[in-house]
A protein has these predicted regions:
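Auxiliary, metal-adjacent structural segments of Zn-dependent hydrolase domains
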Residues: 50-155
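Cation-handling catalytic/transport regions enriched in His/Asp/Glu
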Residues: 151-152, 167-171, 191-196
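Short coil/turn segments at secondary-structure junctions
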Residues: 40-41, 111-114, 167
Length: 198
């Protein structure tokens, strides 16, 4: 027999590990992207080699730039996987130090769990919406994730690339370069912290 609903709620909202309830964030992401799991058909130009384009970017950036963090692989993901990737790639931020007037209301007994759950719900919503609608993180310019994987939201990537009358290899190269640079900047947390603390 499975747990009663109150035990499930308690387990979901009980968080002793960190400043963010990551399990709650994952569950919300999964709920938002539950209808988005099937990968769409491939791009019309079957000659696109994602690995090859990624290696070109990697070699060029290694030649001219030196970053402590940079992606080592590229992966096509479903919207659900993309949301989960986003959650994993923002865990390097120090969410313990976030203070805002809204979150400071939850001091006292159970206050940290409440703050952790609110942040988990917010990040779960953000991850789910990114998975469902976003073609990449670089368009925001403020959330700087850190990951060894350059994630491509396959569904939204295909939709965007097919909107242009241009060579799909050139478009892919431009898109992946911008995403690659966003991941290389993942060591910087200041823009994101300023938003969270205001």
């Amino acid at each position: 027999m499975s747990e009663d609903i109150f035990s499930q709620f308690f387990n979901l909202f009980n968080n002793e590990e960190s400043g963010v309830n990551w399990e709650l964030a994952k569950q919300i992401n999964n709920h938002i992207t539950k209808d988005e799991e099937v990968l769409p058909p491939e791009l019309s130009n079957n000659d696109i080699n994602f690995e090859q384009i990624f290696r070109v970017i990697e070699l060029q950036s290694d030649e001219f730039l030196s970053y402590e963090f940079s992606p080592k692989e590229i992966r096509l993901m479903t919207p659900k996987e993309y949301g989960q990737w986003f959650i994993e790639s923002i865990k390097h931020f120090d969410f313990e130090s976030i203070e805002s007037p809204e979150l400071s209301m939850f001091g006292g007994i159970g206050g940290n769990n409440m703050k952790s759950s609110i942040l988990g719900m917010q990040f779960g919503n953000l991850a789910g919406l990114l998975g469902k609608f976003s073609w990449g993180l670089s368009q925001f310019g403020i959330i700087l994730p850190r990951s060894n994987t350059l994630a491509v939201n396959h569904k939204t990537f295909n939709a965007k690339v097919n909107n242009f009358e241009a060579n799909e290899n050139d478009l892919s190269l431009a898109y992946f370069t911008v995403e690659y640079m966003a991941l290389c900047l993942g060591k910087y947390t200041q823009p994101f912290e300023n938003i969270m603390n205001s």
